[in-house]
Each structure stands twice: as C-alpha cells, then as structure tokens.
C-alpha cells in the first residue's frame, strides 16, 4: 500500500472497488482501493458520500490541505482498534502531574537530541549545539509544562538560528514565523511539519491510542494533540533533514515558492519535490538494534506509539526514539 497525493483540481469517484481520479482536462487515473494507504488532497476536488463511505469502510484515511498547502483536517474512519482500557490509562497519565511531566519531558528530550544530531553534520555550529543542550539541562530543573515548553522553544530558536551557517544564502532563516510564514525557508518548514503531523496521526490511528490525549501540548478541541507530541521527535530527524538536502543540493529553488503580501508558500512544483523525498525517506529502512531486523522510518513512528501503550499499561518505561547511527 502507498500514499497518494492529489494536486490537480477535479473529482474523485468510486466504481466498484476502484477509485477514479479525474482532473479538469478529463484525464482519469484508476487506483485499486487495496493499493491505497492514505490520500492527501491539495487540489480543489469534488467528492461524494458514496466515495467517502467506501473509503471509511475500507479503513483508509484522507487528509485535506488548504490553498497554501497547510493541513486543514482529516477524514478518519471509525476506529477499529478501540480500547477503553488504554484510553483510561492515557487519561490517568495526563491527570497525574508527575507522570504527565515525565512524558512531556521525554518528547522534548527526543526532539533536542535530533536537533543536536543534525547540527553535528555542519561546521561552525558548536556554539549553537551547546546552547541547545543547555536548554535540555534547564528542562530537567523545571516542574511545570509551561516552563518545559519554554526550554524547548528556546532550544528550537537556537536551532533555527544555526540554519544560517550552513543553508544556501537564498534561504536565509531570519526568525521562525508560522502564521503566516513570510519567507521560503519558513514556508518549507511549515509544510514539512504538516506532513510529519499527518504521518504521525496515521500511525496513531493504527494503534489503540487516542490522538486527543496529549502531554506536552495541551489537549484541546479541533486538533489531535498527541500527534503534535510525537511529531516533536521526528521533525528534526525526518522533515529538517529533507529540507537541508533539498536546499543544499539545489533540488529546490526560489521559483518553487509563491510570495504574497506578508505570505510565502510552496507552489505545486515545490510541494511535489518535498513529497517525493519525504515518501522515499519514510520507506527507507534501517537495522533496528532491538528488533534485529530492518524497519522503515514509517514503522519506527508506529513503534513509538506502541512504546507509549506499553508505558501506559506498565509493561515498559517509555524512552523517546533516538537515532543511533
């Protein structure tokens, strides 16, 4: 099974066990449903309830993105891996300040580890590495989630500041701006983070975890905040590594972006370039030192979810994934 990304405007229809994607020019592409894992829709596409019911019955997920390429929402089938016991345990760990803090700190620890790991690949970043590691030391001394997030935020600011030492000059970082991103590197980071978020959400869906109960990010309405927690670990490892490759190997250029008044975003060409590398990265396998077999990066994210379940039920204390190679 694979992910499908729809960029063109048009319509999607179902006929028997096949999905047909038709663009505005009338060109059609047939996709057998058994070949689909997830559908990502970036274009303006017409759908009907017959198709949506079919997709849900087959246990497939659809993610929607707005005009600028940023995540809008998801069609998630009815959960098939429901466990009231796991949900209760998740909530217990949220309500207990000590247990919640442990998990929140773990996500920050995993994120900072991979930030420093990325910077080790580049010259003239030692000072930034030390500042980032200092924030992790500061985080150990905190007692509140808000203080912990402050340490993580400062560490990430130092991390982004370091980008200017090794990224090509066309992609000067400036400061991190999300809403909206105002330059190409900020637009690329925001798009990449959206893709990490939806990938993590997909993997959570295949487990018994409830994606709305989180520990570092405050649970709230209208978002799957556990996806944000787990994504912290993988944004530097996956998204940022791809960004560095695209920019420094001249695989993505300024004409892959559109700039509006106080706004910058990836155009279709730029999105396709990132997604091509992203899909390839998710499929790349490494020899897992504990499982003693090759697993893909996508599977590593799924394993992270299972590690949390083991932690909740008391089988094994959770430790964040840290790339060892």
Curated annotation (Swiss-Prot):
This is CRISPR-associated endonuclease Cas1 3. Keywords: Antiviral defense, DNA-binding, Endonuclease, Hydrolase, Magnesium, Manganese, Metal-binding, Nuclease. GO terms for biological process: defense response to virus; maintenance of CRISPR repeat elements. Transmembrane segments: none annotated. Its EC number is 3.1.-.-. InterPro entries: CRISPR-assoc_Cas1 (IPR002729), CRISPR-assoc_Cas1_C (IPR042206), CRISPR-assoc_Cas1_HMARI/TNEAP (IPR019858), CRISPR-assoc_Cas1_N (IPR042211). Belongs to the CRISPR-associated endonuclease Cas1 family. Mn(2+) binds at residues 152, 217, 232. Homodimer, forms a heterotetramer with a Cas2 homodimer. The gene is cas1-3. Its cofactor is Mg(2+); Mn(2+).
